[in-house]
């Protein structure tokens, strides 16, 4: 492209501080350095994790460009890039895969050493590629997709099938893959099992889809918002309940419902109390509980160790357990083969300039996933 090697001026949604709205600004995006890729974003989803930066529950320096769930096309590449080239359709990866560190080399690992889940805010060389009004702007989780152009490390980019529709396939960059993988890859749900999903947002619905695909015979969805039940049932839940409908602890309610046969539970909210509830609700000896929801920073869990002593398994789950560069292209292929339906998760599509409206839909509970298009 004619812009290769040049600074690009473009539009981005910049966050200048905690609890502030996004400001649509003109920014400058520097060319990619060695082993980096500059990507033109085509569509990006709004995820609850982005809101953690707005609310201050995740650490970040400001100003920052957040967003991490997207599809784009490679505009240019830096020296030494071999896995993608200009014109390739790609999904940015908030969880990179360097294919060299211990986690990448272990068949069960996926938390690459190059991950930025702690708010470092810069690329591998310690600098940013974004400038706005003469000030450096921070990156977010190696991705920063709320902008027309972004720069990523080569390890944070997956080449995908060019037929993938950006406004749908972007969900594979985070929300869908995280939930679906929690069931089929992390928990390894077995046919005929009983599963319980705490939290029926977009990721929770994706967990349900994964449980159904794995052959679970009973899938119970839990949420305090009953407006979410219809969609949960549509994607595969067999029944839904609200904790507000009983004075009993939810673990007792579930035990009464199932005869104490729950093999898998999933916490997809990020609340400490619900994490313990989910652990308490799976079978005391052979149950597995998976923490999927991003926990708040600097908080500690308190729980009875007997919950684990009797044999339960408590697992964490980042990006569904997938090895990002290896598995994301496969998931896109499965989507194109109609093995799962992402349309059920997308409730709103808005132009990028309406990003603040998209977050209001998130706060009001009216949206499952809102996708912004450029």
UniProtKB/Swiss-Prot annotation:
Expression across tissues is: High expression in the stomach mucosa. Lower expression in eye, thymus, skin and ovary. Very low expression in small intestine, liver and uterus.
Spell out the PROSITE patterns in the cross-references: ADH_ZINC
Keywords annotated in UniProt: Cytoplasm, Lipid metabolism, Metal-binding, NAD, Oxidoreductase, Zinc
Required co-factors: Zn(2+)
Identify the Pfam families for this entry: ADH_N, ADH_zinc_N
Residues that, per the record, bind NAD(+): 199-204, 223, 228, 292-294, 369
Its recorded reaction(s) are: a primary alcohol + NAD(+) = an aldehyde + NADH + H(+); 10-hydroxydecanoate + NAD(+) = 10-oxodecanoate + NADH + H(+); all-trans-retinol + NAD(+) = all-trans-retinal + NADH + H(+); 9-cis-retinol + NAD(+) = 9-cis-retinal + NADH + H(+)
Q: Which Gene3D superfamilies match?
A: Medium-chain alcohol dehydrogenases, catalytic domain, NAD(P)-binding Rossmann-like Domain
- GO CC, any one term: plasma membrane
Which annotated residues bind Zn(2+) 1?
47, 68, 174
Q: What does this protein do?
A: Catalyzes the NAD-dependent oxidation of all-trans-retinol, alcohol, aldehyde and omega-hydroxy fatty acids and their derivatives. Oxidizes preferentially all trans-retinol, all-trans-4-hydroxyretinol, 9-cis-retinol, 2-hexenol, and long chain omega-hydroxy fatty acids such as juniperic acid. In vitro can also catalyze the NADH-dependent reduction of all-trans-retinal and aldehydes and their derivatives. Reduces preferentially all trans-retinal, all-trans-4-oxoretinal and hexanal. Catalyzes in the oxidative direction with higher efficiency.
> Would you tell me the protein name for this molecule?
All-trans-retinol dehydrogenase [NAD(+)] ADH7
What organism is recorded for this protein? Mus musculus (Mouse)
Q: Which gene encodes it?
A: Adh7
């Amino acid at each position: 492209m004619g812009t290769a090697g040049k600074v690009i001026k473009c539009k981005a949604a910049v966050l200048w501080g905690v609890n502030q709205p996004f400001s649509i600004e003109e920014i400058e995006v520097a060319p990619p350095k060695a082993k980096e890729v500059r990507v033109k974003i085509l569509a990006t989803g709004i995820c609850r994790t982005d809101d953690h930066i707005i609310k201050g529950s995740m650490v970040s320096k400001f100003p920052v460009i957040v967003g991490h769930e997207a599809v784009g096309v490679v505009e240019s590449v830096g020296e030494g890039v071999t896995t993608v080239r200009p014109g390739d359709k790609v999904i940015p990866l908030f969880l990179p895969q360097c294919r060299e560190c211990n986690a990448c080399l272990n068949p069960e690992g996926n938390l690459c050493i190059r991950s930025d889940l702690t708010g470092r805010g810069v690329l591998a060389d310690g600098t940013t590629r974004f400038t706005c009004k003469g000030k450096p702007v921070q990156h977010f989780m190696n991705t920063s997709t709320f902008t027309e152009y972004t720069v990523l490390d080569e390890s944070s980019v997956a080449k995908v099938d060019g037929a993938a529709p950006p406004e749908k396939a972007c969900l594979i960059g985070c929300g869908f893959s995280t939930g679906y993988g929690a069931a089929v890859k992390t928990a390894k749900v077995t046919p005929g099992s009983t599963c319980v999903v705490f939290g029926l947002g977009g990721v929770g619905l994706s967990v349900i889809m994964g449980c159904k695909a794995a052959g679970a015979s009973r899938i119970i969805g839990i949420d305090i918002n009953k407006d979410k039940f219809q969609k949960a049932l549509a994607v595969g839940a067999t029944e839904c309940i609200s904790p507000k409908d009983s004075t009993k602890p939810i673990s007792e309610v579930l035990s009464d419902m199932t005869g104490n046969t729950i093999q898998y539970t999933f916490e997809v909210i990020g609340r400490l109390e619900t994490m313990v509830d989910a652990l308490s609700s799976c079978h005391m000896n052979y149950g597995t509980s998976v923490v999927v929801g991003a926990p708040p920073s600097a908080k500690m869990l308190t729980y009875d160790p007997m919950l684990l002593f009797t044999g339960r398994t408590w697992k964490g789950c980042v990006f569904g357990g997938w090895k990002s560069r290896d598995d994301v292209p496969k998931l896109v292929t499965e989507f194109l083969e109609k093995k799962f339906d992402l349309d059920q998760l997308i409730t709103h599509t808005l132009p990028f300039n309406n990003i603040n409206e998209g977050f209001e839909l998130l706060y009001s509970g009216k949206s499952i996933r809102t996708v912004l298009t450029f």
